């Protein structure tokens, strides 16, 4: 990871319901994987929430007899939560909006299956950033139990 190139003081931005999440993120159904944000701490950290329900399209094939939320979608949910940190940072600093592109995924581990009825918490923390590249470390938890973890790199591209 690159050393932190910015020395801004994080500002508590609070929470975001689904309407605010849709202002921060460009994703939409069926690929919006963050239902709400319970904490945004400036450009430092964020907790996103995903309520997993049986009526989501991936469960028609993954797996019909024993539905399991796909691990790749857990990683995408972590990436979207990290993206909310980037977008909130841009809004807070009145800078031009950016698209956030996933660039790297490292050290991914899936610990336990996630099933319909679970509420996933995505705990994302910025590790560092340099110019347009930001790096995050994240965990996905259900009822406080670690179900997945990853390190994610993202690039901000001005629109």
Curated annotation (Swiss-Prot):
<keyword id="KW-0444">Lipid biosynthesis</keyword>
<keyword id="KW-0963">Cytoplasm</keyword>
<dbReference type="InterPro" id="IPR029069">
    <property type="entry name" value="HotDog_dom_sf"/>
</dbReference>
<dbReference type="GO" id="GO:0005737">
    <property type="term" value="C:cytoplasm"/>
</dbReference>
<comment type="function">
    <text>Involved in unsaturated fatty acids biosynthesis. Catalyzes the dehydration of short chain beta-hydroxyacyl-ACPs and long chain saturated and unsaturated beta-hydroxyacyl-ACPs.</text>
</comment>
<dbReference type="InterPro" id="IPR010084">
    <property type="entry name" value="FabZ"/>
</dbReference>
<feature type="active site">
    <location>
        <position position="62"/>
    </location>
</feature>
<dbReference type="GO" id="GO:0019171">
    <property type="term" value="F:(3R)-hydroxyacyl-[acyl-carrier-protein] dehydratase activity"/>
</dbReference>
<keyword id="KW-0443">Lipid metabolism</keyword>
<dbReference type="InterPro" id="IPR013114">
    <property type="entry name" value="FabA_FabZ"/>
</dbReference>
<dbReference type="GO" id="GO:0006633">
    <property type="term" value="P:fatty acid biosynthetic process"/>
</dbReference>
<keyword id="KW-0456">Lyase</keyword>
<comment type="similarity">
    <text>Belongs to the thioester dehydratase family. FabZ subfamily.</text>
</comment>
<dbReference type="GO" id="GO:0009245">
    <property type="term" value="P:lipid A biosynthetic process"/>
</dbReference>
<protein>
    <recommendedName>
        <fullName>3-hydroxyacyl-[acyl-carrier-protein] dehydratase FabZ</fullName>
        <ecNumber>4.2.1.59</ecNumber>
    </recommendedName>
</protein>
<dbReference type="Pfam" id="PF07977">
    <property type="entry name" value="FabA"/>
</dbReference>
<keyword id="KW-0441">Lipid A biosynthesis</keyword>
<dbReference type="GO" id="GO:0016020">
    <property type="term" value="C:membrane"/>
</dbReference>
């Amino acid at each position: 990871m690159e050393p932190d190139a910015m020395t801004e003081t994080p500002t508590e931005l609070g929470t975001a319901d689904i309407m605010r999440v849709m202002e921060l993120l460009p994703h939409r159904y069926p690929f919006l994987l963050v239902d709400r944000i319970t904490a945004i701490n400036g450009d430092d950290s964020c907790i996103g929430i995903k309520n997993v329900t049986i009526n989501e399209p991936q469960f028609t094939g993954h797996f019909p007899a024993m539905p399991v939320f796909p691990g790749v979608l857990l990683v995408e949910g972590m990436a979207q939560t990290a993206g909310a940190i980037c977008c909130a940072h841009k809004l807070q600093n009145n800078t031009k909006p950016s698209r956030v592109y996933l660039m790297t995924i490292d050290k991914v581990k899936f610990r336990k299956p996630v099933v319909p009825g679970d509420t996933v918490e995505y705990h994302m923390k910025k590790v560092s950033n340099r110019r347009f590249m930001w790096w995050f470390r994240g965990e996905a938890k259900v009822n406080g139990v670690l179900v997945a973890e990853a390190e994610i790199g993202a690039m901000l591209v001005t629109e």
